[in-house]
Amino acid sequence: MKTLLVFLLLAILVAVLIGNIQVEACKDLTECDTFDICVKGRCYPSTLG
């Protein structure tokens, strides 16, 4: 019973973390900082800055 409870808690934690990562993903250049670029949902520093 304890093992099942721990497994469920871990599954919920992983789901929350995945949800947070998806929320933070950028969709276009305006969501990143001035000198950053959006590539595949993440902001990376550009070489121009």
Curated annotation (Swiss-Prot):
Keyword set, alphabetical order: Amidation, Disulfide bond, Secreted, Signal
Tissue occurrence: Expressed in salivary glands. Highly expressed in the head, body and tail with a 2-3-fold higher expression in the head.
Predominant cellular place of this UniProt entry's protein: secreted
Residue list for modification Leucine amide: 48
Glycosyltransferase recorded as keyword: no
Signal peptide: 1-21
The family this protein is said to belong to: Belongs to the annelide toxin family.
Record function comment: Leech salivary gland peptide with unknown function.
Name of this protein: Peptide HSTX-XI
Native species: Haemadipsa sylvestris (Indian leech)
